[in-house]
């Protein structure tokens, strides 16, 4: 919905939100230069063959080489990217916040990958566009996710961390293990002093969580 040609920018509504910052209003409706939205580079099957696809605003249809029967499985790969917005200027659940004092940024990343639309026995595919002020109809599923960030970053996410020894220091890992059996008193895995030390490092190395 953040692409320059997104239909959500021109939808009819009851008026401008009274909580919107003046700077946000100018950037979103007057002189906005930020171009968001997913950029799809390719869609391939597991053999590396390109699959035909059609992008319709906030949705995409992938054409399978053969019909998919109930309980059958089809695997494919998508390469995509998008620009991360300044959350304070453009709002939303996802984005970054910049701190002028030390040059650091905090990233809050949401809705960052393509999701499968719901298919049910009543309506078939749920193919309503996403307008930015509602919620998705989603299928549930299990995900295996690798997230690579600079080594001085601290990752916070849902799910179960698979490689704590690789991304945490020895002290942090010890606290991580202890936290699994401490239910009355929370254990801080990375304390405030350690956070400040990491913030000043600006590591050029990367870690994958």
Model segments located where?
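Extended, low-hydrophobicity, Ser/Thr/Pro/Gly-biased non-transmembrane segments
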Residues: 12-46, 52-54, 79-209
């Amino acid at each position: 919905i953040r692409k320059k040609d997104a239909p959500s920018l021109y939808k009819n509504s009851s008026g401008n939100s009274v909580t919107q910052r003046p700077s946000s209003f100018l950037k979103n409706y007057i002189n906005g230069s930020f171009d968001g939205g997913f950029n799809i580079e390719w869609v391939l099957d597991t053999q590396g063959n390109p699959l035909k696809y059609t992008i319709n605003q906030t949705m995409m249809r992938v054409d399978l080489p053969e019909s998919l029967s109930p309980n059958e499985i089809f695997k494919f790969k998508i390469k995509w990217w998008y620009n991360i917005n300044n959350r304070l200027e453009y709002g939303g659940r996802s984005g970054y916040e910049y701190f002028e004092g030390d040059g650091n940024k905090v990233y809050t990343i949401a809705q960052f990958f393509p999701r499968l639309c719901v298919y049910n026995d009543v309506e078939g595919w749920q193919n309503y566009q996403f307008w930015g002020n509602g919620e998705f109809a989603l299928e549930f599923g299990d995900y295996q996710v690798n997230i690579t960030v600079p080594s001085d970053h601290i990752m916070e996410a849902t799910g179960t961390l698979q490689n704590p020894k690789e991304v945490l220091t020895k002290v942090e890992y010890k606290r991580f293990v202890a936290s699994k059996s401490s239910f009355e008193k929370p254990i801080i895995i990375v304390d405030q002093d350690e956070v400040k030390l990491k913030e000043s490092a600006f590591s050029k190395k990367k870690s994958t969580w």
